[in-house]
Amino acid sequence: MLDYTNVKHVEKEGAFLKKDTGLEHVVHKFDNLYDGIKKEAERYGDKVRYYYHENGEEKTFTYNDMKTHVDYIAAGLTRLGVDGKFTCVTGDTHPDYVAVYEAVASTNGVIIPLDKDISNEQFTGFMQFCNTEVVFYTASQQKKINACLSELSLVKYFIAIGADGSDFPNDPRFMSFAHFFEVGKLAYEEEDIRPAERNVPDMDKMCAIIFTSGTTGTSKGVMLSQKNLVTATLDSNAIIDCKEDDMFVSVLPIHHTYEFTCSQLALPNAGASTAINDSIKNTLRNFAKYKPTALILVPLYVETMYKKIWAEIDKKGKRKMVRAAMKMSDALLKVGVDIRRKIFKEIHDAFGGRLKYIVCGGAPLRPELVKDFDSFGINICEGYGITECSPLISCNPKGW
């Protein structure tokens, strides 16, 4: 964890003002995952945390909504007698995917986020390995769940997020998330079952198992604690100056720790809003619609964007002119004149017109891409990490 000993503590906001390493911005401190959810709701309230699509309809999800959902999910798990158990969550990125993750961890359970694209054999293997008792999944996973059902006798409940139950098999273990939510709401409000609020978590206890192939190609379960996740989140906030008025578009798989820690923990701690990309084919359309100020990506996305930029430039026969403009803008920048966003307006417009920086990790990125994007006026903060470190190890701050 970063050294906060020389950092001014802002008592009123419960935050740190990070002044070492040349960074000067507020980092809101929280003690555990639920403490983070509670403090975010207090700071940002009805501000939109997520824009997302469900059943073809655009919806919003506020910071207050997140706290309410975590409270009700935690209460529901306790009411059904499966709090503190091994719980799987799989499927598409969804606000309630995040809420389930946080609620399970906040009730002394172990969350197992699984890749939605793994084979049926891998899925059942991971579930059996962990003695999983509860499965939360989005509607896109219904066919896989149905196909694997005979191998999942240990599972007590299958809870479908964003589904009406019309595709459920004839099995009493299935319920819609809406029904489960009502169970949790009743338990929380009428029976005073409030485990997330009252639980004092062991920060060193395992709260998540992340299956990753790593460098060996053999799947393994990485065990993470709340201390791991909280530390990585606060360090991410300290390095990257994300602000309350920032807008992100989430495009990476949510089961990866990189995406979850950075996009689903660090961004909300800073009060940013995130639009969940509903489909790869809609990415550019969503950039235009939501106008992100920053993105969290892997090199494959950055490489693809880079190739498309130059393909469009070459299509217009403007490569030499653009290179000359880049050289000129770089020279002007050295004397304090920044006209990059004006000169390369067309490039910025392709990303919605407000993109300032990209956080990139997961694999090495070619240095020339970092340099060229900087010439265009888009800073790339390149990071390095591994799942075992949940995942942050190092990152160059904005402007470095």
What role is predicted for each listed range?
Residues 57-61, 74-118:
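Conserved AMP-binding/adenylate-forming
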Residues 45-48, 160, 179-211, 218, ...:
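Conserved pre-ATP/AMP-binding loop-to-beta segment of ANL
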Residues 9-18, 36-61, 166-168:
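AMP-dependent adenylate-forming
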Residues 1-4, 106-183:
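Structural core segment of the AMP-binding/adenylate-forming
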Residues 175, 293-296, 305-400:
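Gly/Ser/Thr-rich phosphate-binding loop
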Residues 60-64, 178, 207-233:
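Conserved AMP-binding A3 loop
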Residues 116-148, 232-249, 280-293:
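Conserved ATP-dependent adenylate/AMP-binding module captured primarily in the ANL superfamily
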Residues 230-247, 254-341, 379:
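Conserved AMP-binding/adenylation subdomain of ANL enzymes
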